[in-house]
Design a protein with these regions (language model features):
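Extracytoplasmic
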Residues: 66-68, 88, 98, 111, ...
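Structural recognition of the beta-strand scaffold that forms the well-ordered cores
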Residues: 102-105, 123-125, 142-144, 160, ...
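Ligand-binding "clamshell"
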Residues: 134-146, 203
Length: 229
């Protein structure tokens, strides 16, 4: 759980969310009229089996087989910190695949998606929000989620305000200036848009949305009174 400045107040809202592990094991196949089903995938991919993710190209010459696998974790405040956190995992991955494994510290969700789309990133742990964009635009194939002892790890959406405000419930957000994180963020944009609407508040209509870029930017912005919540 994030640590908040003493000047802020947090409201907890239940949210089903998990970290997703994805893999890109092949290069993008060329757009082809022969593709019977593509769904919402980019034209470079095909989904003939209807499982909502890109199919492995029928032409094996398009499969990727890099001598070095590039691994990345979802963008956080300091990407370099997580390189050490995942050192043991990368060693395990190298042992199991027989390949070298290198760390890529993505600075943003978009950078992570683009890196996999261009073939520069092969395996990644990504946030829930960008997953759909990664699947549709970059050929992400989700295959696992974080868990332990048969239990899945999740998290909660947290609505925080400055303690000097009179915001006590979601309806108090009306007419305010509210920080969201990025358009692709789940807890920082997509989830509140869905949950708040159910609570009678429509983000972007009932209050002004300002994208802060990062979760910690939102927290510090509230602490400094740049945003109402």
């Amino acid at each position: 759980m994030a640590a908040f400045p003493k000047s802020t107040r947090a409201l907890m809202i239940g949210l089903t969310g998990v970290m997703v592990m994805v893999i890109a094991a092949w290069a993008a196949s060329s757009a082809s009229a022969a593709c019977k089903n593509r769904g919402n995938l980019d034209v470079r991919y095909c989904d003939e089996n209807g499982d909502l993710v890109a199919d492995t190209p029928k032409d094996s010459s398009k499969w990727l087989n890099p001598s070095t696998l590039i691994f990345s974790y979802t963008p956080v405040e300091d990407p370099s910190v997580y390189e050490n956190v995942f050192a043991e995992f990368m060693t395990y991955l190298a042992k199991k695949t027989g390949k070298r494994v290198k760390w890529y510290g993505a600075e943003s969700y978009a950078a992570q998606v683009e890196a996999m789309r261009s073939g520069r990133l092969h395996i990644a742990g990504i946030s829930t929000g960008p997953t759909v964009f990664g699947v549709n635009l970059a050929g992400y194939v989700p295959f696992s989620i974080m868990g332990k002892g048969g239990k899945i790890f999740g998290y909660k959406l947290q609505l925080i305000t400055h303690k000097s405000t009179n915001i006590r419930k979601v309806s108090d957000l009306k007419g305010r200036k509210i920080a969201h994180v990025t358009p692709t963020s789940n807890s920082g944009n997509q989830a509140p848009k869905a949950y708040f609407k159910e609570m009678g508040v429509v983000p972007g209509k009932d209050y002004k949305i300002i994208f802060s870029g990062k979760h910690d930017n939102s927290i510090m912005g509230v602490a400094n009174k740049d945003y109402d919540a």
